C-alpha cells in the first residue's frame, strides 16, 4: 500500500502540471518541458515538440513555457506561441490551470464515488439527549426527512440542521410507521482544536447520535451525485482554508504540519480503493489551494505579478524578483523540512 500511496502523490503532481500544460496549449503557448520532479532528468522523450521528463527529486514538478523565462528577465519574445505574447487573462488562466485541474480531479472523484454508491452511516438514532427525548424521538428511529428535505445518511443531518431556522419538522420511521416530530435545535459551544477558551465553535444540535452498527449503501442520480460532489469539494476547501487561517493567526501549532512522510503514511493507511481515492481527492484540493498562496515560486505569486504588471503597471526589478523567488524557495524548503521533522518525531 505504501507504493500505491507514493504513486498517488506523484499522480496528483502530474494532474497539477497537466493543468498548466493543457491550458497553455489551448492558449497557443508552446510547452518546451513537462517534468515530474526537479533536478537531473533520469529519463525523457520528446513528443509534439515537448520534452516529457522524469527527474531526480520527486517532490513536485514543472512545465517550461516558451518565452516565460525571457519575460521574467525583461527580454522580448515576439513569436505567437510565446507566453510573453499572450493577454493578461490568458496568462492568469495558464497559471491557474494547475490548481483548476486539482480541483476538477477532486470533484470528479467525489462524483463517480457517489454515482457508484456510497457506504454511509444510516440516519438511525443510536443515542439521544433530553431535547430529543422531549420531542418524542426514540432510540432506533430512522430519520427520513428534515423540513421536507430527504435524509440519506447521518452526516447529512448536521448540514441540514445548520442551515435551518427555527423549529424543525422531522419525518421518522418507527416500527414500519411514518411519524412526524417537531423540535427546536439547541446552540452548542465547544472549545476549538487550538484549546483556546476564547476561541469557541458554536453550532446547532438536535441531541442525537448515530447507531454505529447501521451501515448502508446510498446511490445517487447524476444530478444528486454532482450536487454531492460539489458539496464535498466545498467542505474540503472550507476545512483547508480554516486550517491555514488558524496556522497563520497562531491558533494552531506548527507541530501539526505534516511532510511527505506523513502524507504518504496517511495515504498508505487507506484500507480500500474508495478510501484511497477520497484521501487523494482531499489532498488534491490541498495541493491546489497551497499553490494559489501568494508565496514567491508558487503559482499564486506569479498570478499576483501578472495583475500588478498589467493592471497597476508595477514591475519589480529583475534582481528583486530573483531574490524574492529564492526567498520563496527557501521558505518552502524550510516548511518541507519542518513537516518532515514533525513526521519523524511522531514516528519516534
From Swiss-Prot:
Which GO MF terms does the UniProt record name? metal ion binding; metalloendopeptidase activity
Query: Where do the PDZ domain residues begin and end?
Result: 106-175
For this UniProt record, give its keywords in alphabetical order, as a comma-separated list: Cell inner membrane, Cell membrane, Hydrolase, Membrane, Metal-binding, Metalloprotease, Protease, Transmembrane, Transmembrane helix, Zinc
Residue numbers annotated as active site: 17
How is this protein situated with respect to the membrane?
Multi-pass membrane protein
Q: Which InterPro entries match?
A: PDZ_sf, Pept_M50_Zn, Peptidase_M50
Q: Where does Zn(2+) bind?
A: 16, 20
Cofactor (UniProt) = Zn(2+)
Q: Where are the transmembrane segments?
A: 43-63, 93-113, 247-267, 275-295, 324-344
List the CDD domains: S2P-M50_PDZ_RseP-like (cd06163)
Disulfide-linked positions? none
Single Gene Ontology BP annotation? proteolysis
Q: Look up the EC number in the record and give it.
A: 3.4.24.-
Q: Predominant location of this chain? A: membrane
Q: Which residues form the signal peptide?
A: none
Can you say where in the cell this protein is located? Cell inner membrane
Listed GO CC annotations: plasma membrane
Task: State the family it belongs to.
Answer: Belongs to the peptidase M50B family.
What is the protein named?
A: Putative zinc metalloprotease HP_0258
